[in-house]
Design a protein with these regions (language model features):
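Conserved small/polar residues in nucleotide/adenosyl-binding loops
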Residues: 1-9, 219-220
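ATP/NTP phosphate-donor binding region
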Residues: 10-77
């Protein structure tokens, strides 16, 4: 009967190990208000959950490289940068593990492009579900990006804008930092190859994006 089906599903799910990586400071630390409910949802979905809070830039990458192979699924929560770090770790370790994303940053443009709910519990429900889909990613040197890679004007804004300002002002914090860079605008001589075509010119800005909208959270080319 139906009860036996649920029992069998539960037995299968209990063998699944999940690594939950999140940035505790992203988006005004809103993850803290939902953490218990999110973990409870993961456990009820049949996962044995390990929680890790990122402590510094690239910490999520290091965690995935060192321990990712021991898990059946990885879920991350934070801004677009946190997701980039997790994907970089998966690529460096050559792991093929399903990942889930619970957006909690100041912009979350990439999540919006994928139609991931803004409400954290709804996003968590999708992250532990069984509906999977492939997603394009970009790579250069040893870095991987799922959102955007860019060079030139304003590309340092994301790194120079403090987490405290982002939590207080959101998008406006990026604008405030960007205005400071208008005094010094360098250009770059570039050769671009695409679809069998080549062109060269001087550029003050360039980007490759995987999103339908762009704020200012960059990976540097």
């Amino acid at each position: 009967g139906l009860g036996d089906v649920y029992k069998r599903q539960g037995e299968l799910r209990m063998s699944q190990k999940l690594l939950f990586i999140f940035n505790p400071h992203a988006g005004k630390g809103q993850i803290k208000n939902h953490l218990v409910d999110i973990v409870d949802m993961m456990v009820k979905a049949g996962f044995d959950v390990t929680i890790y809070t990122t402590q510094a830039q690239a910490d999520a990458t290091r965690k995935v490289v060192e321990e990712g192979a021991g898990y059946d699924r990885i879920v991350c929560s934070g801004g677009d940068g946190t997701l980039d770090e997790v994907m970089t770790g998966l690529m460096q370790a050559k792991l093929h593990i399903p990942i889930g994303y619970i957006p909690a940053g100041s912009t979350n443009d990439f999540a919006n492009s994928l139609g991931i709910p803004k409400e954290m519990l709804k996003a968590a429900e999708r992250a532990v579900g069984q509906n999977r889909f492939p997603c394009d990613i970009g790579d250069f040197n040893s870095d991987t990006f799922v959102y955007i890679a860019a060079f030139g004007l304003f590309t340092e804004v994301s790194y120079k804008t403090s987490q405290q300002l982002k939590n207080i002002f959101g998008h406006v914090a990026y604008i405030m930092e960007g205005v400071k860079q208008l005094r010094d605008i360098p250009s770059f001589r570039m050769q671009v190859e695409y679809d069998g075509k080549v062109f060269q010119d001087e550029f003050i800005y360039g980007m490759v994006t995987n999103s339908v909208s762009v704020a200012v959270s960059y990976t540097h080319l």
